[in-house]
Amino acid sequence: MQTCRRRKASGGQSTIKWSRMCLATLCGLLLLGIQIERAASAPAGEDAAATTMPPLDTTTDAPDAVAATTTPATTAAEQSSSISSITTEAADGSTTSTTTTTEAANKSNATETDFTTNVPVASSLPEETSVRSTSIEPITSTEPTTTPRQETEGPDQHMVFSNTEPDQSHIQHIPLRDEHAESSGADDATTEMQRQREQDQQQNELNQISNEQDDVVKDLNNFRHPATLITASNSNSEENVEIESDKQVETTTTAVPAAATSTSTEATGTPPTGTPATSTSTVPNEREEDPYHVHILSENHDRLAEHEDYQMLSTSTEESSTTSTTSTTNSTTESGIVAGIVVSQENKATAEPSTATESTSISTSTTTAATAATSTTSRARAMHMNDPEDEAATTIMPDSESVPVINIVEGQHMLQQEDQKDEEEEGVVKESESSSTTEASTTTTEPSPFVAFAGEGRSAGGGNDIELFLHHNGSTHEQLMDLSDVSMDGDQNEGSSKTESSTTSTTTTTAQPETEMPKIVEITASGDTMQRECLANNKSYKHGELMERDCDERCTCNRGDWMCEPRCRGLSYPRGSQRSMANPNCLEKMVEEDECCRVMECSEPQLEPTVVATEGAAPSTNGTGESAVTLPTTDDEATPKPRTDCHYNSGVYKFRERLEIGCEQICHCAEGGVMDCRPRCPERNHTRLDKCVYVKDPKDVCCQLELCDVTLDDHEQQPTPLQSNNNEDPEEIDPFRFQEQARDAGGAKPTCTFKGAEYDVGQQFRDGCDQLCICNEQGIHCAKLECPSNFGLDVQDPHCIRWEPVPADFKPSPPNCCPESMRCVDNGTCSYQGVQIENWSPVPANLTGCDQHCYCENGRVECRAACPPVPALPPADLPCHPALARLLPIPDDECCKHWMCAPQIPKIGGAGQDEETEATSTHSSIPANETTTTTATANKSTSIPSKVPQIKKDEEKRPPASGAFYPTLDGKPPKSIGGLGIFEKPEKPEKAHKKVQHQQQQHQQQEQQEQQQHQNDVIFDGDRTEEQEEPLPPNGGFVPFQFGQQHPHQPHLGPYGFYNPVKPVYEDYNPYEPYDINPNGTPQGKPPPVPTSQSDLFNILGAEQPGHPVHPGHGGPPRIHPGQTQKDNHNLGPQVRIEQILQHLQQTVPGGPPPPPPHQQHQSLTPQLHPQQQQISQQHPGHYVPIVHSGVPPPPPGHGIAIVDGQTVAYESYPVIPGLGVPQHHPQQHQTTPQQHLQQTILPSSSTTSGLSTQASEHSLHQNQGKLAKQQQSGANNLQPDIEVHTLEAIDPRSIRIVFTVPQVYVNLHGRVELRYSNGPSNDTSTWEQQIFAPPEDLIATSQMEFDLPSLEPNSLYKVKITLILRDLNSQPTSSIYTVKTPPERTITPPPPFPDYRPDFQDIFKNVEDPELTVSETNASWLQLTWKKLGDDQMEYVDGVQLRYKELTGMIYSSTPLIHRTLTSYTIQNLQPDTGYEIGLYYIPLAGHGAELRAGHMIKVRTAQKVDVYGFDVTVNVTKVKTQSVEISWNGVPYPEDKFVHIYRAIYQSDAGKEDSSVFKVAKRDSTTGTLIMDLKPGTKYRLWLEMYLTNGNTKKSNVVNFITKPGGPATPGKTGKLLTAGTDQPVGDYYGPLVVVSVIAALAIMSTLALLLIITRRRVHQTASITPPRKSDAAYDNPSYKVEIQQETMNL
């Protein structure tokens, strides 16, 4: 002040300025004093507490900022005495709540209360023997009351936190144990009346709240402890505060009951002087032992949350039937129902929580009468550790039932969203605190849950908070987390709040709008607390260590507690949530910072899911009855929002849980309990073009992808994104990903990104010369560039192999990506002997000759041997004796020959002659090499008796054709694929004009043939498994076919004269596999070897009168009597049809009865005809009569006749070739057995004939005759059925093939074919199975049709009937009923033993000579081996030779490549030196000719030892020793030196010297092996050795030599260490004299030279020039080297 007066006295403007500054300073000091006085009453405590701990900071309710200032610690010392005295005075006033409240209200603002409650211990904590005591003190900041928050629980759930709390300041000091968390429970309420009375008292106290502390509280916001650590963060806490919230009450005298004050004084034993002490005095200096204080200055969110904790600690809960009304009674009595918490005096400054719902600070004496509809979750802030002794002194163990422990974690409140609305709907229920001697006046119907303090500033209250606490806060305190009684289903009801009726009066206030408030946390921690460890999964973590809980949270250890936060923030979400399924146009991308997080990148605008952008959003309630509104904030560090479960379709789904509703929708549980449902599949483009098709989505079976042609027009768009010709996986983040920019501030235009470049929508661009791309709304669409010059090249030149652009050096570069045109540079033509051969064409034989067959392929002529190799001996499968085999030309090939039987030309009888011998022999001896060539255009068969078609290797075992005749309409073989099934033609009534005489004559001829062939033939049954041989019937051995019961030894064929064109067996069988063998040794179902004479059959069977069959014992085909005249066969009728031939075959005796059924026919006719058979067989030898078409040349029959149109016709001009396998003078061997007939029928020839299957014919013919007999009776005049079947065969065991023709009149009509078939006994075709075959467009285009009938049963006899169903006609042409038998499933039987011995590869080389494998030369790393050459007869079986070797100690043989069979030596490389090897020689056969064979024995040999050429030793010798030099020499280096040594280094060292000196010499060929060492010291001992640098990179040293130089004068300066060469170093002397002499001599020489030149020049001047120029010498000029040199010199110039 004096300074101010002096400056004022001085006057002037400076005085005015100083006066103003002084005034401002005084005002500031005044305000500071007022603030200090106000702050002195805020923290409750004693003098000692005030001395050791400064006044704590408070927060204002201003929504914009929280100011905090620090003051010296001595300021708070002035508060203690007044506070203590007031507390004592209040304690002496009254023990009731009302009186205490009134008395406390009349006192100054420095009064404070002390609440003491008994905390019941949960049963789940066996290690705790006493209840933790927590002292809670009110502080100076007081806020207006608001309706407390309610938490809605289900009616069947416990009210987790139903405490209605008095508003307190958020600054607390709560002692903690080692777990850094305290469990506390609310006291049980007693009666409703008591609670109502206490609420009325609280309402009265609430009305006494003074609002005079507004300015004081603002000043206190600037007050701060000087030694605290400040951390600030923005939080979007509950910012809807009451209008009175900015008027904080600094003291709590008007709201603190006196009873509580007295309780605090008594319980803690605090004397008026402020020294802290407990009631038991066990820890008198607890205040001093407290290591740290934690001060938290938070925004309204934290302050209100802590107020809830204080309410929870100081009130009790009660849940009524419809409402949950909570009240708190603080007592220290021993009632088992009351839970007390003792708050120590030193912790009162931070022990008082504030209301977490309304951001208002209310003094502890302020009470509000309200009814809590639901339990109010609270949070507490535990900052100090409390000793067990202190707890034991002030806490009484309750006998009440244990209640759930709810963890409250500092800093975060997980259920604020749902609780804000509830708190506004109910009044703040505040109960006055009872004294320590007052019994608990309130009880609850249900036990209240404990409250576990589990860290700073965070709470997890009730059942709803436990799961969130576990998943988000991560505070794992085993002693405080008893979740046994906590319902985890509370999360389901978090999103909804219920407002119950209130029976008590409420005090409502107006909430201020929500604004962001910075949260300032002040922490002062000591070292031992900072070093506390956290436990998780039986693992301890230090303070500050991080722990990741899968992809959900990232937790930090903070003084024994886990501080957890979600790993994925903002728009990112955890991996595996499958959010991408919500929008199929979005791609999931990994976040670079965290691999567990994903972010969505969409190619089109997507409906944003209801998720909050940041995790730190804080809830607020805007009014009563409104649901919680989630507002995003920009503070990621704020409290995470609660994830409410979703209720959808009577189901409950967790946050981010995925639900698939069929193939219609996919739903995700979003935040706020909203189920976000979207279509599962993208919407289709309903106006799609024909170019687009839908295919199944590989990632979702319910969806389809639309794929379109990339060559779209300008107006077309491809609906499905990322689908083009690029084979990119949609899941992959391809280079042309469509990126949609953010649509927030800038509203950027969407663009496309392709290979790092940005393109606008609609922009076209080229991707090099590969593809043309366009950017549209769906993304990048690219089409491959195709040049017009590349179109139609195959049309321009189909034979061109290689094209090149014009010009040839064209290189594509945008925009010129296509050449002008293309020209062919290679069309594959070949040049052979000056003749151009087209590509893929054979070289004409007139150019290649008979040696080789050449072929042109891609410009190269490839040749191979023209003829197959011919073995030296006849093959064993020839049908004749090897002595009769000859090398004959292959038919149609004059160059090649093969083994075949020598042909024998028989005699040819004339017309009308019965040449029985020739006929029978010829019948059985049709040559094996005879073939029938059937053309497709002419109805004729050409027989070539003298030539055999060329047989390839794969055809050598097939029988050649035997002049087969095909009884079809066109004479051609029907189309068929081999099978064992057969079919039969129906029998026709025979014509009446056929004579019996001809039949009897033929019968006699046939019996004679059976007698002659009896001894050489074998009877076999094709369908029997056993093999039997029985005597054959006489007269040629022909077996009759019975129409009755089948004879056990007689196979049955089809109707007489009809050929069943069936190929041998279904072709898909492997011919190398084992196969069935019939009794005569011929494989069934396989092409046999070249057929023997016993199997050369005609395909036409003789005719027989059904009325005169032969005896079954003698057997023979039906025959025709030769009574009919034989005509010349060259002029046959032009219209002979197969039906006429069949009719003749099936005719009956004129006037005779019709044939009986099959079984009766066989039984009745057999005994009658036996005598007649014998008589006829004796009179007439048998004849084989073929029946043919008229106009078709038939094969040569044995007797020269055939039946044509019912008339016998002679074929005189066709020669008959007898059999080849048997000498001709034995007529019996020329006969043919019925088995051979069957064999020829079953086993076809090479390519033109097909045989019948005996296995099928046995049943099919037999059962078919009964049907045919009926047809014969009813339709005697019917010549043919409507539909003719040509082929009915089994192509495999389960399918058959049908080839048939329809009448020509039905061609070009519309209709279908109905096939009825059955393998059952029923004859009713209407009950048979049906199969409809539809020709293309239902049009019968041709008369011949072919169908396959699948899905049949194997080894079954099927009856088949074909019906033609016409569209517009009532006529239905049908066929007869045919039978076919499917073969059984393939059975594998071993092959038969060959009758002759054929040696294999092993047998051929069994007796081969030893190849005498020897080692001719050896080395350390290789061996050269030699062996004898193979013989010529054995070389053709060997493909190559191979050597196999191994070490004697090894187990695995190594092998050389295949060595040519003509080589006799080989060198094995890369062997180990000095190692023994075992080597053997192996012959490798050709493929398919057996196994390899080892030749001779294994030999053993050892490689030589390895020779080291650098293993020489060098010896150094000292030759001449002088005073200062020494000469050395060495020896031992091989010649030449420069091959082994690069440089010599002579190293010498004296005894006195410390360093080595050396002399180097380069090794040269033919140089001296020595050097001279100079610069030595006289009379000195030296050690010398030689070191050589070898050419292989190594070094070698010699021996060491010691020598002593001769004594002499002092040594001259030397050149030791320099590179020296022997003889180059001379002693250094006086060189000046010699130098002068040399100079003089040089000068004289120069002068002499000049004089001589002058003389020569003068003489030339006087000479005359020559008349003729000197002749030029061209010798040097003509030298080529001279010219080159001159040219080079000229060019260089």
From Swiss-Prot:
Pfam families (alphabetical): fn3
Where is the protein situated, by its record's location annotation?
Apical cell membrane
Which residues are noted as glycosylation sites? N106, N109, N330, N473, N538, N622, N685, N827, N846, N929, N939, N1323, N1419, N1517
- Residues of the signal sequence? 1-41
Sequence ranges on the Cytoplasmic membrane side:
1657-1693
User: What does the UniProt keyword field contain?
Assistant: Cell membrane, Developmental protein, Glycoprotein, Membrane, Receptor, Repeat, Signal, Transmembrane, Transmembrane helix
State the source organism's domain of life. Eukaryota
Tissue specificity, per the record, is: Expressed in most, if not all, ectodermal tissues which produce a cuticle.
Q: Classify the protein's membrane topology as the record does.
A: Single-pass type I membrane protein
Q: Which residues cross the membrane?
A: 1636-1656
User: Which spans does this entry mark as compositional bias, Low complexity?
Assistant: 70-113, 133-148, 250-284, 314-335, 350-380, 434-448, 496-510, 998-1015, 1035-1055, 1106-1123, 1160-1180, 1223-1257
Cite the SUPFAM superfamilies for this sequence: Fibronectin type III
Segments carrying the region annotation (Disordered) are 70-205, 230-286, 311-384, 416-459, 486-515, 616-642, 910-1056, 1070-1131, 1147-1180, 1222-1277
Bias type Basic and acidic residues, positions: 167-182
The job of this chain, per UniProt, is described as: Vital for larval development. During salivary tube elongation, possibly modulates cellular adhesion between the apical surface and apical extracellular matrix, and acts as an apical membrane determinant that functions in apical membrane expansion independently of crb and Cad99C.
* Domain remark in the UniProt entry: The extracellular domain is sufficent for conferring apical characteristics on the salivary gland membrane.
The protein's name: Putative epidermal cell surface receptor
